[in-house]
């Protein structure tokens, strides 16, 4: 039962409820008019009778998210990078803007305002929750739609738990999510890949790039290889290497929160009071574990590299620190992913004739080339790239190089507009005349440029 009391110029609604521990609590809510107080009284009595009453809570967005995050990490056995990424999103993209707001006062328009604010926010405005001083150039680079979409996704998941936990009656996160960025990936042609590899003189960089181009590897997978992953005699002497581990540098805070079941090894810190750790972990999904077939050139390079590792150890065994990894420095310590990226950036600075791409772009370049030479055999390429599903592979590499589009257009024109000697649908083309089967035509149309599809529709209707 709820009661209305006039207190000065306002009206108060007093009611009693049981908290989450079953304890009886009194609550007062003030309203400027009697009408508002009456409406609230009716609402409270209805919810108490129906068992849908929401226990008043002053918990803030920041308090809730920092309580929710480790619980989800433990429940879903997140990898360190997953925890670190979500923590960064909360600390840098959510708490600075709505962290002090009470959960029960959040409305959908607060979420929309957050998305609008983030769309006008420069990248790196906050790091570990601390406001950063940006240069004028840095202020011109804004958060992407994909980043804002990730904020929406995280809040949608978190606030749904808030509903289940009885903190919110319903989630304030809008149904419509911010649109992801659709910027086309920059990749290299096969000629550029070959020329770039030939120009790389640094042995560590050369081998890393060679492995990436053959196997479409991720950076962490490259430096996560061990000599035991290599089998020169497998596949009737072709040779293979297995991808089943990944190397990452993660914050110690994340390492302390995650389930250590996926952690294979934690490398010793190089610096005292380091806030991060270098780890070797199992690959992120079952599909990421895969076997890659060597090329003869890669096979020879790997043999020479292993011989060099043995020679390095023999030079000074007492000072050699055998990390057990395939990629090692001359002193035996493991090569980190960041070193590969730095070496690649240095090489790019010295070779401006090549299109500028990030190191991960080599993986995209390799996967795209393999899709081309396989005739679009998605399942075969998926086995190499380690994508979880064929759809993910197709969606990731939906782009096609300009040369392929020109060739596709040429084949379409030759096949579609080919003249037949007889109007019969069973007519046999003259010798040397371009032909195209219905199956091939359908395959071409499925991958055709939108303009070509539009031309076909027009031709069919006229």
List PLM regions with ranges:
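Short, Arg/Lys-rich segments that mark the N-terminal edge of DNA/RNA- and chromatin-recognition modules
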Residues: 1-32, 240, 244-274
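Short, polar N-cap/turn motifs at the start of nucleic acid-interacting alpha helices
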Residues: 229-237, 375-398
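Catalytic-site neighborhood detector that most strongly recognizes the C-terminal catalytic loop/helix
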Residues: 179-180, 187, 245-249, 385-411
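N-terminal DNA-binding module of tyrosine recombinases/phage integrases
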Residues: 7-112, 128, 310-322, 402, ...
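C-terminal secondary-structure termini that scaffold catalytic or DNA-interacting sites
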Residues: 232-235, 245-289, 298, 410-462
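Basic, Lys/Arg- and aromatic-enriched nucleic-acid-binding interface segment
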Residues: 127-145, 149-151, 164, 168-227, ...
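N-terminal core-binding DNA-recognition domain of tyrosine site-specific recombinases/integrases
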Residues: 3, 17, 70-161, 182, ...
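Short, basic (Lys/Arg/His-rich) helix/loop patches that form interaction surfaces
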Residues: 123-127, 198, 202-203, 215, ...
């Amino acid at each position: 039962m709820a009661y209305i009391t006039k207190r000065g110029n306002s009206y108060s609604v007093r009611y009693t409820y049981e908290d989450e521990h079953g304890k009886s609590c009194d609550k007062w809510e003030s309203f400027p008019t009697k009408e508002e107080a009456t409406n609230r009284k009716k609402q409270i009595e209805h919810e108490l009778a129906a068992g849908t009453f929401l226990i008043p809570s002053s918990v803030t967005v920041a308090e809730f998210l920092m309580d929710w995050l480790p619980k989800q990490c433990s429940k879903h056995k997140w990898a360190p990078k997953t925890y670190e990424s979500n923590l960064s999103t909360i600390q840098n993209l959510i708490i600075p803007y709505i962290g002090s707001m009470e959960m029960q006062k959040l409305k959908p328009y607060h979420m929309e305002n957050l998305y609008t604010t983030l769309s006008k926010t420069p990248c790196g405005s906050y790091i570990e929750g601390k406001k950063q001083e940006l240069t004028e150039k840095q202020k011109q680079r804004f958060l992407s739609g994909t980043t804002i979409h990730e904020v929406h996704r995280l809040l949608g998941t978190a606030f749904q738990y808030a509903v289940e936990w009885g903190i919110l009656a319903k989630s304030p996160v809008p149904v419509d999510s911010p649109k992801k960025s659709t910027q086309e990936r920059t990749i290299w042609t096969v000629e550029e890949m070959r020329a770039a590899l030939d120009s790389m003189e640094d042995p560590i960089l050369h081998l890393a790039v060679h492995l990436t181009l053959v196997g479409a590897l991720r950076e962490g997978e490259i430096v996560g290889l061990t000599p035991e992953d290599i089998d020169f005699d497998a596949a009737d002497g072709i040779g293979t290497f297995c991808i089943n581990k990944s190397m990452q540098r993660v914050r110690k805070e994340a390492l302390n929160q995650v389930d250590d079941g996926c952690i294979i090894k934690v490398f010793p810190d190089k610096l005292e009071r380091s806030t991060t750790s270098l780890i070797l972990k199992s690959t992120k999904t079952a599909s990421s574990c895969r076997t890659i077939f060597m090329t003869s050139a890669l096979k020879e390079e790997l043999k020479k590299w292993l011989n060099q590792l043995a020679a390095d150890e023999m030079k000074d065994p007492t000072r050699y620190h055998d990390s057990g990894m395939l990629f090692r420095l001359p002193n035996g310590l493991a090569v980190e992913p960041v070193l590969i990226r730095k070496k690649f950036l240095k090489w790019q600075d010295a070779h401006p004739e090549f299109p500028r791409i990030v190191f991960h772009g080599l993986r995209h370049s390799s996967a795209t080339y393999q899709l081309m030479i396989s005739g679009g055999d998605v399942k075969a390429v998926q086995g190499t790239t380690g994508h979880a599903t064929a759809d993910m592979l197709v969606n990731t590499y939906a782009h096609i190089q300009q040369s392929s589009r020109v060739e596709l257009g040429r084949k379409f024109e030759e096949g579609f507009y080919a003249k037949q000697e007889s109007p019969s649908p069973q007519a046999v083309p003259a010798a040397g005349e371009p032909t195209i089967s219905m199956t091939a035509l359908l395959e071409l149309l499925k991958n055709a440029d939108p303009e070509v599809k539009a031309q076909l529709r027009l031709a069919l209707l006229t």
